[in-house]
Amino acid sequence: MKQKIAEKFQTLFLSEGEFFASAGRINLIGEHTDYNGGFVFPGAIDKGMIAEISLNGTNKVCAYALDLDEYSEFGLNEEDAPDQGWAKYIFGVCREIIKRGGNISGFNTVFSGDVPLGAGMSSSAALESTYAYALDSLFNLGIDKFELARIGQSTEHNYVGVNCGIMDQFASVFGRKGNLMRLDCRSMEFEYFPFDPEQHGYKLVLLNSCVKHELVGSPYNDRRASCERVAKILGQEFLRGATMEQLDAVKDQISEEDYMRARYVIGEEKRVLDVCDALGKGDYETVGARMYETHWGMSRDYEVSCEELDYLAEVAKECGVTGSRIMGGGFGGCTINLVKTELYDAFIEKAKTAFAEKYGHEPVVIPVVISDGARILE
């Protein structure tokens, strides 16, 4: 990938630049907890974005997206926003840095990625983090890492129109090889936890169902509103920290649907902490058990699964897979699977054939390894 970028850069700009990279991410457990002030447990992965960049002495950005074979040129003022969707990410990062007082000028760049698009692995956050990190480095801006993550998040909010949380950008910037990060979405404190499945005889693999169910209304916002209603009745800002005893005490004051949503979130909060404890003991069986619990909680209580993802989780269980669950917001996308190495090939074969027989296409198999986040590539 780096070689192809370098060749295109040389052809377009007749020069060489510096290389920067950032990563996509997985979230092992802790789904729909971020907007409830809870914990998430992401890690950066060995798939991401690479960009070559050199300053060009103008106030223009000349950018080429290698995978799309598209070129864009734009200025750095608010009114200079490019038309191409992908270019808005780079423009947004530039604008967010400028808004924070960063003094930057034009540059030439070529980028490419191997994060599968639409698989819930945060290709957009990887792109934002690559450029935020690169511009901070090239212009010696001294921006702290949390602010680099916020620059990516603000880019989504203000230039892409996606009201995302901080987890994706956080994982992309702070990712560390062989570690997951437990992020407290209320205090923004975080802690690294060693996670090396290979060393313990396991593999981590995503199965992309390649299904995305278009939904009527805004189910994401509906789930969030349910949680906020219950938190308010409990007299809390967030559901974080609420107990099942407290929830059961107000059961007759809330709808059955709101009760189910809150039950899932309270359970998920505990599952994240259980998984952290289990990893400390090298107990991957407990990690896997909690993953299955999360899947069926998301399916039955939070109702964000779909038939195809439930089927993949069932196939995983039948094949003796240690843990499997929906990853991401739901309604399609991937399952994340923790599989014993000796069962891996048989599981993948079974998942592909069984899924294809039932739904007419194979799931896409994406093995992942926990890796470093944003960095300079030598």
Language-model region placement:
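Gly/Ser-rich oxyanion-binding loop with an adjacent helix/lid
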Residues: 1-20, 26-39, 73-77, 83-196, ...
